[in-house]
Amino acid sequence: MSSPQRRKAMPWALSLLLMGFQLLVTYAWCSEEEMGGNNKIVQDPMFLATVEFALNTFNVQSKEEHAYRLLRVLSSWREDSMDRKWRGKMVFSMNLQLRQTVCRKFEDDIDNCPFQESLELNNVRQGISFPQVHSCGCCMGCGVGTGAADKAIPRDKGK
């Protein structure tokens, strides 16, 4: 015979166990180029728009004077949301390699702006958490859950 407290704890224990399995999934640390371009996600127009949104958000929130530009997509994957509200919607996750440019953040043509020349690489590594956005894009730019770009960690410093 189990106590009422044990019965209440069982659903929580089960949900923690199920969420723990999601953490066991690991992704290869190789770029899309090294994977032979087999990943079709990087060609998806919605993924490209999401990358552009993430890069723009990073530049807007960054305290740096100069803009960052995409160097390459290190890895990417599409996730299925467990949340009932977002079920069936597109959720992209990605690891991007960014590099600082000579252009200021709000100049018109950042896409064609050259990278800064320096002996020290200025790539950054950052964990940024965007709200789960579905394909219509209606939640893009709402700012909920976005990480602060000023907390970016210089990737190559201290090595």
From Swiss-Prot:
SUPFAM superfamilies: Cystatin/monellin
GO molecular function, one term: cysteine-type endopeptidase inhibitor activity
Subcellular location(s) of the protein: Secreted
Matches recorded under InterPro entries: CST9-like (IPR043250), Cystatin_sf (IPR046350)
Tissue-wise expression: Expressed in heart, placenta, lung, liver, skeletal muscle and pancreas. Not expressed in brain. Expressed in epididymis, kidney, testis, spinal cord, and thymus with a strong expression in epididymis and kidney and a weak expression in the spinal cord and thymus.
Inducing or repressing factors: Up-regulated by bacterial lipopolysaccharides (LPS), in some cancer cells such as promyelocytic leukemia cells (HL-60) or myelomonocytic leukemia cells (U-937).
Record-level GO cellular component terms: extracellular space
Signal peptide: 1-28
Top-level lineage group: Eukaryota
Gene3D superfamilies (alphabetical): 3.10.450.10
GO biological process terms on file: antimicrobial humoral response
PANTHER family in the record: CYSTATIN-9, CYSTATIN-9-LIKE
Protein name: Cystatin-9
